[in-house]
């Protein structure tokens, strides 16, 4: 569990105030939830990033708010890709004994045997829905794909996990599969396709009419 300090923001702030705040390396945030009143705070962006890298997206953070320390999770945050800047954070105060359902990323481990034969690994499911108390939520769920051959797949029911949490996805939900390589056409097939595409010159209707008209004039 990592710690992060915050400073309470007093009064109502304008857009200009928030812009100035962000330009000094601080991120406006709000704390709400279990056992606490909605409180506007600011945190250091660099320190926040360090904490998230340490505990993960669903990790528990001990957030200093005034004279109190509150256990929180990041409920949501906004990021500006143009400025490469976190613009706002929602901290949710939590009850450590109350279960929550969150999305946990799937991490593929190993190299599928089938890829050595040209197979391609496809992953239709990148996150799993997990229910657990905050301190039992895994940072990620590892799925070993090293034994997968071409046309093999793994579903939720196939993965082996350890920990005090429940995966809420359907057992049949596909996580990963190894598909056969796309076969490129042979030279003979390419020539055949080119032959089919080649057509005779279309009949020019205008020219025919001119010829027919000329013949009529000669007959006259």
From Swiss-Prot:
Part of the 50S ribosomal subunit; part of the 5S rRNA/L5/L18/L25 subcomplex. Contacts the 5S rRNA. Binds to the 5S rRNA independently of L5 and L18. The gene is rplY. It comes from Staphylococcus saprophyticus subsp. saprophyticus (strain ATCC 15305 / DSM 20229 / NCIMB 8711 / NCTC 7292 / S-41). GO terms for molecular function: 5S rRNA binding; structural constituent of ribosome. PANTHER family: RIBOSOMAL PROTEIN L25/GLN-TRNA SYNTHETASE, ANTI-CODON-BINDING DOMAIN-CONTAINING PROTEIN (PTHR33284), RIBOSOMAL PROTEIN L25_GLN-TRNA SYNTHETASE, ANTI-CODON-BINDING DOMAIN-CONTAINING PROTEIN (PTHR33284:SF1). The keyword RNA-binding applies. It comes from the Bacteria. One of its GO terms (biological process) is translation. This is Large ribosomal subunit protein bL25. This is one of the proteins that binds to the 5S RNA in the ribosome where it forms part of the central protuberance. It holds the Pfam family Ribosomal_TL5_C. Belongs to the bacterial ribosomal protein bL25 family. CTC subfamily. HAMAP family: Ribosomal_bL25_CTC. Residues 179-220 are annotated as: Disordered. Residues 184-220 have a biased composition (Acidic residues). GO terms for cellular component: cytosolic large ribosomal subunit. InterPro entries: Rbsml_bL25/Gln-tRNA_synth_N (IPR020056), Ribosomal_bL25/Gln-tRNA_synth (IPR011035), Ribosomal_bL25_b-dom (IPR020057), Ribosomal_bL25_C (IPR037121), Ribosomal_bL25_long (IPR001021), Ribosomal_L25_dom (IPR029751), Ribosomal_uL5_bac-type (IPR020930). Keywords: Ribonucleoprotein, Ribosomal protein, RNA-binding, rRNA-binding. CDD domains: Ribosomal_L25_TL5_CTC (cd00495).
